[in-house]
Design a protein with these regions (language model features):
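Phosphate-centric recognition/catalysis
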Residues: 2-16, 20-36, 40, 54
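Conserved active-site and cofactor/substrate-binding residues in soluble primary-metabolism enzymes
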Residues: 4, 19, 24, 41, ...
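A generic local secondary-structure boundary/capping motif
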Residues: 11-12, 27-28, 34-39, 47-49, ...
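Short acidic-glycine loop/turn motifs at beta-strand connectors
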Residues: 33, 52-56, 161-164
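Glycine- and Gly-Pro-enriched alpha-helical subdomains that act as flexible
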Residues: 48-49, 53-103
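Short glycine-rich phosphate-binding loop at a beta-alpha junction
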Residues: 105-113
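Phosphate/ribose-phosphate-bearing ligand recognition and processing surfaces
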Residues: 116-127
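Divalent-metal-activated hydrolytic enzyme cores
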Residues: 127-169
């Protein structure tokens, strides 16, 4: 079983890791029960890699902002772009993991991104806001963060293996 949002992520075969892979772009998420690798590139965005180590079910999201701003269109709030906001992306990811058979009490997290990659944004450190949001959200949900690489001033490329929880950067 697999689930994703409105816009289907790009699937390909990764020769380096010898595995089917799914590339996530900003505002996308993907949940799978299969042995696949999920890949994304992050700047100020954050990716939450969640998995149930007992079932091997896992998924990743890639959100751009912590919450919906007041000027977002009604379409963005309710349809395909909802996953670009952390508040929706996290709920959707957790709900789809449970629908796929994961036990919410067993879900573990690894979170990445939130870099300050555009230094001219002095007033609004979006990466910091994203990083604070994801750690607070997971704490509230009772989902432990086993690994993280958040904030700082660099971009990241994340390779996540949901079946076993391994992550490479």
């Amino acid at each position: 079983m697999e689930s994703c949002n409105f816009e289907v992520p790009i699937s390909y075969y990764d020769k380096r890791f010898s595995i089917d892979a799914v590339k996530l772009l900003p505002g996308q998420y993907f949940v799978t029960t299969q042995d696949k690798m999920l890949v994304t590139v992050l700047g100020s965005c954050v990716a939450a890699c969640l998995y149930d180590p007992e079932t091997g079910i896992g998924g990743m999201n890639h959100f751009m902002l912590p919450t919906v701003n007041k000027t977002a269109s009604e379409f963005e709030k309710t349809q395909g772009m909802a996953a670009k906001y952390g508040v929706h992306a996290m709920e959707i990811l957790i709900n789809d993991l449970v629908k796929a058979g994961a036990n919410k009490a067993q879900i573990k997290a690894k979170v990445f991104g939130g870099g300050k990659v555009v230094p001219s944004f002095v007033q609004h450190d979006v990466g910091k806001f994203n990083a604070e949001f994801v750690t607070d959200f997971l704490s509230t949900e009772g989902i432990p963060i086993l690994a993280s690489d958040l904030c700082d001033v660099y971009a990241r490329k994340v390779y996540f293996f949901p079946s076993n929880g391994n992550v490479f950067m």
